[in-house]
Amino acid sequence: MMKVSAQNNFIYTNYTQNYAQNSVKAKSPSFCGAQRLTHMNIGMMGEGFIGNVLLKNVTKGTDELVNVFKNFDCGNEKYFLKNNEGGTIGEIMLKINKYFDYNRFIYKEDPSHVFVDKLRNYSNPNTPFWNKETDFYEGTGTRLLQIAQRRSDEAQCVGNIKLIPMPESRRYYTDKIGMIKDPTNPYGSAFILPPDKKEPLSKMYGGL
């Protein structure tokens, strides 16, 4: 029987909130200049604005730094990408599953992972969540997955991410991201990021 860390619930959430209350950035969210997530510990940031990521605005033909916001939802973490007008471009919810003990006969490698839920891309007209009032930003879904991957590394889940894709988005996850069906449950609907695809994902569009 696997033992799951309590960090995806009360303990971890309160630790990050307490840390953030003593953080200079948390007390001063209006710091000057672009704050990319490249070298930032995302998990240690409190709720609210945490930094920027670079996206290509296909509609306008420009590169834009969009804002990243974070909040907690019943022990899970939610991240939002918003443009400078405050419109939401995309969002994602993450659940951290850190296993301290697991069956080595079933799992050849550490099964700890970040479970991705409710990944929504509002800027892409080819997704069911498209908001026609929003400009089309290239790489929105990829940036959200990179945040999930970063949180997996920070939480010592060895970069593993897992999700259950919608039927219309499976080709995106398999062909572009390189995800595969969970080999420990081949009859299930979950997909994982295999080891050889972790670094390529982290470098897409120049990385976070």
Residue locations for each model-derived region?
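N-terminal chloroplast transit peptides
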Residues: 1-6
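Non-catalytic substrate-recognition and accessory regions of acyl/acetyltransferase enzymes
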Residues: 7-143, 147-164, 168-208
